[in-house]
């Protein structure tokens, strides 16, 4: 299809007329109508770049890349040039960039130095219906900009999900509704029953395939999916010829379902493609390719395919009705990744994926009664997430009345209190909520407050392990690089064992970093060791950018100090996750109890009285992830003010918060005087980093 034939471009005159009469407009249209790619071009052709850049925010890195590439090709140019993009640790813009695609976090960073966005004529907030925390914060800040700049324009781009809330927020601004031709989609409610005869008639009879299938924790789900595909391929449904889109809650279930389909009786007729956020750009773009002749494309996706990705040719949608959603507890500073039923609006977005190019069918793997009991819209992220980073950025902008900031949806008071407490534990805020010197230093890094705080601690107190602390921050900024392919778990764990260190995961990260960075053939290294190359390359890139930030501050990047100093620096940022053992395999932090070390940790089933964790997450139980051991003396070095409280957790003695360090030094458990290894198992010498500037 010619992009100019898309519904959005066809309504160019309506959009520009509304924008000429209003500072803010909401553009609402279905996914796939061209909002993301055609609105920037419409603005560029209308001359909006003459008085400043056209800024487009995206909630995801992968969209930032693909959108900038698509728009550049449509304008017959290359990136960077007239079109450029910017995201965390990656700036691909040029002096003549007129259309700037950026992650929403980048716009927040830029507003720190230019609160009224003087270099922009217009900002388009794309995918606003997702209501991420950054999107809500951006909308609040942009509202302040239009109060000062009469020449500034805002477009809020939304799929057909509650666009009225944006109009009300911006003083009843107009909503430009643009319909896209949609074909009818039949809905079939086909609820999952408990697994009984576990899909034996759909699975090939090899022992290996049966083992893959029976290991799954979602046998009934996969049985239902196989039965629907069986009916579709036999021609026993009303489905038009076309491809299949399956919505599943997470990466794990997608991989398991992929294995089931690839070992089914229909495997030779299916072109199965996974789609989730952690995949690289090239892997994600496979979903847009046509299947090989004689095959049907089956895309198995998370909710990323609801509104962020448009896949033509889908005629059958199989909707589990589930998504994995993060919920944060501000009282315990812990997160929970919960598989939860999606809202009615999300269900309907999924259904609509089947009717873009021809009539379709949506199989809902839940009952009509279940659907009718669901909430109309998803819970906004601001009501279920950690607010400490947003509050830190607000303080940086001089906004200290957190409770009365004009968010489109007010966050819970408990969430604000918890975020303030978290920032106070990191020494980031003064009593009047202005930034302390430590808080100001933290803001130099585009990281979560806990990660920037560990870097600041290394700068101020442990300069000899600054490089190692930057590596730790890079690892905690990404997903796990360890891969456990179904059916190869034993081999993968044996490979990962090569990087294990008795001082826990944070020491193991250093070994893995050194081994990967020194590997000549990084692809082969990752294949041999069951590691995710894209994640490790991302870690290298983050480390390089953190090096640049620190160097720009005029601070030398030391390395090779003691393992104890390294763990102290890391633990100061992670003070919320310093825990004491309270029984066999059980730990408590200052705010959470009944914490177990995750089985994937080096420290699983290891004996330690005190530990530090990169995060504490509730899944089936409360788990500490990324764990290393600590000694009593280290606890005093990490936080003299909180040391007595933390140690009392081990002793089970109630004690008030200590305001000063005790003179006594408890007997050490684990030595913190050893030095970081000079040589890893890979033979790479651990040395000071010579920065290539």
Locate predicted features.
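Extended, charged helical/alpha-beta scaffold domains that provide interaction surfaces
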Residues: 440, 446, 453, 457-693
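P-loop NTPase motor module signature
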Residues: 1-454, 461, 547-555, 560, ...
């Amino acid at each position: 299809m010619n992009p100019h034939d898309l519904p959005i471009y066809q309504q160019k005159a309506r959009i520009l007329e509304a924008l000429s009469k209003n500072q803010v407009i909401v553009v609402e249209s279905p996914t796939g109508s061209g909002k993301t790619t055609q609105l920037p071009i419409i603005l560029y052709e209308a001359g909006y770049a003459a008085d400043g850049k056209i800024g487009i925010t995206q909630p995801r890195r992968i969209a930032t890349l693909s959108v900038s590439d698509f728009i550049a090709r449509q304008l017959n140019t290359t990136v960077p040039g007239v079109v450029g993009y910017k995201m965390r640790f990656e700036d691909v813009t040029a002096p003549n960039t007129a259309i700037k695609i950026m992650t929403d976090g980048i716009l927040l960073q830029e507003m720190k130095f230019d609160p009224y966005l003087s270099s922009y004529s217009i900002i388009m907030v794309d995918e606003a219906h997702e209501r991420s925390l950054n999107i809500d914060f951006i909308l609040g800040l942009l509202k302040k900009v239009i109060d000062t700049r009469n020449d500034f324009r805002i477009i809020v781009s939304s799929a057909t999900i509650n666009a009225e809330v944006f109009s009300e927020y911006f003083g009843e601004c107009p909503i430009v509704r643009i319909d896209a031709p949609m074909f009818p989609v039949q809905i079939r409610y086909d609820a999952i029953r408990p697994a009984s005869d576990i899909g034996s008639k759909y699975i090939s009879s090899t022992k290996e395939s049966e083992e893959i299938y029976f290991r799954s924790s979602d046998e009934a789900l996969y049985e239902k999916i196989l039965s629907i595909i069986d009916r579709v391929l036999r021609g026993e449904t009303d489905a038009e010829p076309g491809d299949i889109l399956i919505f599943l809650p997470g990466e794990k279930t997608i991989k398991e379902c992929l294995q089931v389909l690839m070992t089914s009786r229909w495997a030779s007729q299916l072109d199965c493609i996974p789609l989730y956020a952690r995949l690289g750009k090239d892997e994600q773009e496979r979903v847009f390719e046509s299947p090989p002749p004689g095959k049907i494309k089956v895309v198995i996706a998370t909710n990323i395919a609801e509104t962020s990705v448009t896949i033509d040719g889908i005629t059958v949608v199989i909707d589990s009705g589930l998504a994995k959603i993060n919920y944060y507890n501000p009282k315990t500073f812990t997160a929970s990744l919960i598989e939860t039923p999606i809202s009615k609006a999300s269900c309907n977005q999924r259904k609509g994926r089947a009717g873009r190019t021809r009539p379709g069918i949506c199989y809902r793997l839940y009952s009509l009664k279940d659907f009718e009991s669901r909430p109309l819209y998803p819970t906004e992220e601001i009501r279920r997430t950690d607010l400490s980073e947003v509050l830190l950025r607000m303080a940086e902008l001089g906004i200290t009345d957190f409770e009365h900031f004009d968010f489109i949806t007010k966050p819970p008071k408990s969430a604000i209190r918890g975020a303030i407490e978290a920032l106070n534990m990191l020494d980031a805020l003064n009593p009047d909520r202005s930034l302390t010197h430590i808080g100001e230093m933290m803001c130099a890094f585009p990281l979560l407050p806990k990660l920037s705080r560990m870097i600041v601690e290394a700068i101020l107190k442990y300069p000899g392990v600054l490089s190692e602390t930057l590596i730790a921050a890079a690892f905690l900024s990404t997903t796990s690089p360890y891969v456990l392919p179904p059916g190869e778990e034993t081999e993968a764990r044996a490979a990962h064992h090569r990087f294990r260190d008795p001082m826990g995961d944070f020491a193991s990260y250093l070994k893995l970093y050194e081994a990967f960075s020194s590997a000549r053939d990084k692809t082969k290294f990752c294949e041999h060791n069951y590691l995710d190359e894209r994640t490790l390359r991302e870690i290298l890139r983050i480390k390089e950018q953190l090096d640049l930030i620190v160097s720009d501050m005029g601070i030398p990047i030391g390395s090779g100090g003691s393992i104890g100093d390294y763990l102290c620096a890391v633990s100061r940022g992670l003070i919320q996750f310093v825990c004491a053992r309270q029984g066999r395999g059980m730990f408590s932090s200052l705010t959470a109890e009944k914490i177990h070390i995750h089985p994937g940790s080096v420290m699983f089933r290891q004996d330690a009285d005190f530990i530090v964790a990169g995060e504490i997450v509730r899944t089936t139980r409360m788990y500490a992830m990324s764990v290393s051991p600590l000694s009593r003396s280290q606890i005093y070095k990490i936080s003299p003010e909180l040391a007595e409280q933390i140690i009392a957790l081990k002793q089970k003695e109630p004690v008030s918060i200590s305001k000063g360090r005790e003179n006594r030094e408890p007997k050490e458990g684990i030595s913190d005087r050893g030095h970081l290894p000079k040589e890893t198992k890979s033979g790479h010498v651990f040395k000071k980093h010579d920065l290539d500037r």
